[in-house]
Design a protein with these regions (language model features):
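Short pre-catalytic strand/loop immediately N-terminal to key active-site residues, enriched for Gly-Thr
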Residues: 176-184
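C-terminal folded domains that constitute the principal catalytic or ligand-binding module
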Residues: 188-193
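N-terminal accessory segments that position/regulate proteins before the catalytic core
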Residues: 1-159, 166, 172, 185, ...
Length: 241
């Protein structure tokens, strides 16, 4: 019997055939009248927000799609990825939680550079806090915008992609494992956001409207039981005058 979650995943996947309909749905949304919280009759008990290192850092977190025209170095990209590393090279203990220490979400990177040889498909190795080269790609800015279904200015340096491998977690938690997989990806996304918030030289933005199958092909994962969950595009910050 087919898992209903996979029907949901297939229904919500974006392809070159349904991306226009998805865009029309977004453009027709009334953002001025959206609901942002629940309402109850009693007034809330209000507490003063105490300052801490974490609270100061979270205030710096923001989504930016305006990049500078220079490229980040690989070491700068690694400043972001290192937020996902393991502790003491122990893969069951990392900087973010995972149900049953399954760590069913892997991180891949499409890096961009001035030279074609710098356009690489990379796998992030959390155990060694490093990247392994898988192949090269030939994506330009126009193609990147179409694959991400977003517009940006300037030059992005990398597209970080989170890919789920559900067999690692459903074998223990059955269909409930899909929820845990999405929670894990969300925790990873937050780690990336906080890592970027620490730097004045790096900017970035979460990307949710990815073309699933096309990106999985670029990652050479189209034959695997893998699910493209979400991504994060990063680049050099625009220099202030």
């Amino acid at each position: 019997m087919r898992d209903p979650f996979l029907d949901f995943w297939e229904e919500s996947s974006l392809t070159k055939y349904n991306i226009r309909e998805y865009g029309s749905k977004m453009s027709g949304f009334d953002a001025d009248n959206k609901e942002l919280k629940l309402s109850y009759p009693k007034y809330p008990v209000v507490f003063k927000n105490k300052k801490s290192k974490l609270s100061l850092l979270t205030k710096l977190r923001k989504s930016v799609r305006n990049f500078g025209n220079s490229y980040l170095s690989l070491s700068q990209i690694m400043q972001v990825l290192t937020q996902l590393s393991s502790k003491e090279k122990d893969l069951e203990h990392r900087t973010y939680p995972s149900a049953g220490a399954s760590y069913c979400v892997e991180t891949f990177v499409l890096s961009f550079g001035e030279k074609q040889s710098e356009n690489k498909v990379l796998y992030y190795d959390a155990e060694h806090n490093g990247v392994q080269e898988i192949s090269n790609h030939d994506l330009n800015n126009n193609r990147i915008e179409k694959l991400c279904n977003i517009s940006f200015s300037g030059t992005p340096s990398a597209l970080i992609l989170f890919v789920g491998f559900p067999d690692r977690i459903t074998i223990k938690y059955s269909s409930r494992g899909y929820r845990f997989m999405l929670i894990e990806a969300g925790a990873m996304l937050q780690q990336i956001a906080l890592g970027i918030a620490q730097s004045k030289k790096i900017s970035g933005c979460p990307v949710g409207g990815l073309l699933d199958d096309e990106l999985l092909k670029i990652l050479k994962l189209e034959q695997e039981n893998s699910l493209l969950i979400t991504g994060y595009i990063i680049g050099a910050s625009v220099k202030k005058p």
